[in-house]
Amino acid sequence: MGNCKDKDHLPAFTQIDTGPDSPTWLKQAVFYQIYPQSFYDTNGDGIGDILGIIHKLDYLQWLGINAIWINPCFVSPFQDGGYDVMDYYRIAPRYGTNRDLYQLCREAHRRQIKVCLDLVAGHTAIDHPWFKASCQPRRNKYSDRYIWTSSAISEADVPLSFIRGYSERDISYVANCFYFQPALNYGFAKPAACQSWQQPIDAPGPLETRKELMKIMDFWLSHGVDGFRVDMAFSLVKLDPGHKETIKLWQDIVQRIHVLYPKVVLISEWGNPEESIAAGFDIDFMLHFGLEGYTDLMLSEKSFFRRHSDGNIGNFVKLYLEQAAKVQSKGLISVPSANHDVKRPCADGRTVKDLKVIFTFLLTWPGVPFIYYGDEIGMRYIPGLASKEGGYGRTGSRTPMQWDDGPNAGFSMAGKDQLYLPLDPRQNRPTTKKQASDPRSLLNHVRALIALRKRSPALQAVGTLIPLQGENNDRHFAYLRQSGSERFLIVLNPSAQSSQVRITGIKIYNLAPQICHGTQACVEGDNIQIHLDGASYGIFKL
């Protein structure tokens, strides 16, 4: 089956550590992503709110969570679920008030839980007062806050999305995603001489935009927020090959913010850790876009964590190790369970057994784990839902949290037809209440994994990772985690077939099972022989 010393294409990295400016608590961090409109409703309007998050902080503390990321909660027309902001300085009334958010920070901190907000840095809503002012033909303070071409009927030969004929201003604006998300102007990396509308990054307009972004960050940090997940962080400077100027822009922002808030946590939606960590972010995600590899885990037809598949994990491991070697002590990488843009793990026929294997991997892998709300109980991706607030095919991953077997699964006291989205219609849908009392549940499995991770430095964000098995077409995966003298062997078999694993080439002083299912292991001299049933996992302390 191979020796760990022969894995030339799966090289070990000896140590990953957070940089000197990164908060040390990130080494033990387990994040929980909250889609606020679907989490918990306290006022009976069918939409989750900030007070609902406060109400459930004790649950998150019980689970072992020590940081939360809240999707956009600012004033918005909600054409894209809040990723179209109208006012960066005010909480959307449907979620509550600014005072509610300040209270959330205080209550979370009392439970040793950090709070990170979602910062949409690259664009605003089309209804934002800045954009309305920018649309005016007469020049004003906001004329250059967005990117406008020189003529509404010109065909600019550049790879950007132009929206024409929207306003009386005789020019087109650039949109980032949907037409109603006009791109903020941070300048162009190399403005074309023949395109006078392409402003350099140090022009007055782009500099004012940058200053406003820092002002927004300062406002929320001064009220107790611990950091931000930055939406599309790579997209700010336009026509920027390799994102070189965007990296410089973020380096400038991070340096200035750190003067006032040295412990701020910055998480990027970038998908290329080598670039984002260089830009000054503490964490970057392995994503469904960006560098290839993440989809090999759960999302593709031949993903590794699919029971009836011939997928292997080698491509993901190779990519992860390459990126980890490049960022080294400067930052961390996250492999999320899912997010609001992709299918949940509980999709495509996966069962609780399958999900337990997935979480065993996610919570023993280096970097910072992010759990999408409801994944810890195996909430299902609901196919075929009508699009809500620009969700389209993503809508099925945004349904209300399932707390108990009461009305609306304990999410809201509103009428069924008033709920933000329909609930999972299954009679046996999972709930936190049922699973909390079942020691064999997915929820208690996740809780036990988090507890083991927290008390075991070798299983946390930094330290040694040595892949032992999983190359070629293996349907199992084995790896070693180590910190100082503490060592753990993790073995996974997500397939339907049983498997035999033989580990050689490592010193064995002990073989103590920690969290295991369907595994039988024995020591034979300097070797470990492990039998893995289908859909099984094992964590052994060596």
Outline where the language-model segments fall.
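Acidic/aromatic-lined carbohydrate-recognition and catalytic surfaces
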Residues: G2-K211, S222, A233-G280, M401
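Loop/helix patches that line or flank the sugar-binding groove of alpha-linked glycan CAZymes
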Residues: F13, L26, H258-L260, G280, ...
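Beta-sheet entry/capping signal
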Residues: N66-A67, Q112-K114, M217, D226-R229, ...
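Substrate-binding cleft/loops of secretory-pathway carbohydrate-active enzymes
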Residues: A125-C135, W270-E301, R380-Y392
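Active-site groove signature of glycoside hydrolases
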Residues: I216-L239, V335-N339
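Aromatic-lined glycan-binding groove of carbohydrate-active enzymes
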Residues: N315, Y320-H340
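Beta-strand-rich binding/interaction modules
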Residues: S498-G518
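C-terminal beta-strand-rich structural cap/linker in extracellular carbohydrate-active enzymes
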Residues: E524-L542
